Amino acid sequence: LIEHSGTRRNLEVDFFGGEPLMNFEVCKQLVAYARSIEKEHNKNFRFTMTTNGIGITDEVIDWCNKECHNVVLSLDGRKEVNDRFRVDLAGNGSYDRIVPKFQKLVKARGGQGYYMRGTFTHHNVDFTKDLFHMADDLGFTELSMEPVVAPPDSPEALTEEDLPKLFDQYELLANDMLRRQKAGKPITFYHYILDLKHGPCIYKRISGCGSGTEYMAVTP
């Protein structure tokens, strides 16, 4: 990444899925190595940890708060929605195990530098209920929810019939965010963070994907 980044100073590394905490020692070693060489090459590494939460410990929390510019915490929302897919080898849902860990990590970060990231499917096209659950019941304010990517014949795949419902959900979310803003209790929705005057598209059209020159994702 350093060799191919040219004059770019800020470099992003995302520890991503599978599940990075299955190999936490390698994450620590890679960060330590990057820190040892970044000044020599006039680079500034920023690390992100994306995790399903099962492997979070006090050590992980301390390390993330010291080394990670951002932490992405995977939670699909309501318990029944999350536990439909996020299960362990025994088939047990993860919700009850991970929510307290996520809350502890976010509190230790001062409520900053994190996102709750969920995925909505054909089974929960009412995904604002999942976002509002995370905000109102769990106390999270930095939220992201993305559509599933699945084969068209998958039971989880979104359909043409789902689209009007989804459009209504995004409208509902926008209005609710305005209400919260006026009440002095705002929430952030990642995909609504847009610069209406200077969008990102022109840069992507000129330079393409930044993978390998300014950004890299590392799996276990």
Task: For every predicted segment, state its role.
Residues L21-F24, S154-E156:
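A generic structural signal for short coil/turn motifs at secondary-structure boundaries
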Residues L1-D14, N23-V148:
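Radical SAM/AdoMet-radical enzyme domain recognition
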